[in-house]
Regions:
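H-loop/switch region of ABC-family ATPase nucleotide-binding domains
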Residues: 178-179
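A short, surface-exposed alpha-helical micro-motif characterized by mixed small hydrophobic
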Residues: 184-186
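Conserved ABC ATPase "signature" C-loop
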Residues: 196-197, 212
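Conserved ABC ATPase "signature" region
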Residues: 1-3, 84, 96-113
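The feature captures the beta-strand-to-loop junction immediately N-terminal to the Walker
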Residues: 32-34
């Protein structure tokens, strides 16, 4: 990512102010900061939801973003049809989606509801399906924004294990936004600390955690 910023014009506030960093293939990086630090804005710019006011962002690889897990579904489509819809939007061929279909259904634990319209699903069911699609479509870049709190404790552990697996075994690049320093340390070797839209630290994960904790105490 080259130096960029995002200005919120109605308050003349820069949500992200002259931030520049690079994440290499296979690297796992935690992004820390208090609410309003600019973390989610960075993720939205990386995924193309919004764009920087100046500067540029370059992304090389298939991005799977665990941001708003229940968004992007067609409520009138069945769960199965939505798997194909989201897979196509992520650039997969129908044959590739078909190969992954049962794995996605099994992970989401919604087999008996998969051929019902998504509008009949609970928010938890939609979140589980959204998570399952995004982690099982063989992403090259995985972006996670506090999405590991899906479902009950057993399913949360399952989600954590899955992210760990694809990051370690599949050489997926991970950008992980979290307030959990324990999870960040489990997944990542590098940490970036944001404060009031500015990047204040970029380096080894233990030091990043120390710096982040100091910002929380302020």
């Amino acid at each position: 990512l080259y130096t960029f910023c995002k200005k919120i014009k109605y308050q003349e506030k820069k949500a992200v102010d002259n931030v520049s960093f690079e994440v290499r293939r296979g690297e796992a990086v935690a992004l820390f900061g208090k609410n309003g630090a600019g973390k989610s804005t960075i993720l939205k710019m990386i995924t193309g939801v919004c764009f920087p006011t100046k500067g540029k962002i370059e992304v090389e690889g298939r991005v799977s973003a665990l941001l708003e897990l229940t968004s992007g579904f067609d409520p009138e489509f069945t769960g199965r049809q939505n798997i194909f819809l989201k897979g196509q939007l992520l650039g997969l061929k129908d044959s590739e989606i078909k190969e992954l279909e049962q794995t996605i259904i099994d992970f989401a634990e919604i087999e008996e509801y998969i051929d019902q319209p998504v509008r009949t699903y609970s928010s938890g069911m939609k979140a589980r399906l959204g998570f399952s699609i995004n982690v099982n479509i063989r992403p090259e870049i995985l972006i996670v924004d506090e999405a590991l709190s899906v479902g009950d404790e057993e399913f949360k552990n399952k989600c954590t294990k899955k992210v760990n697996e694809i990051v370690n075994k599949d050489e997926v690049t991970l950008l992980f936004v979290t307030h959990s320093t324990a999870l960040a340390k489990e997944f990542c070797s590098r940490g970036i600390v944001m404060q009031k839209g500015k990047l204040t630290f970029d380096g080894e994960i233990d030091e990043a955690i120390k710096r982040y904790k100091k910002t929380v105490k302020k």
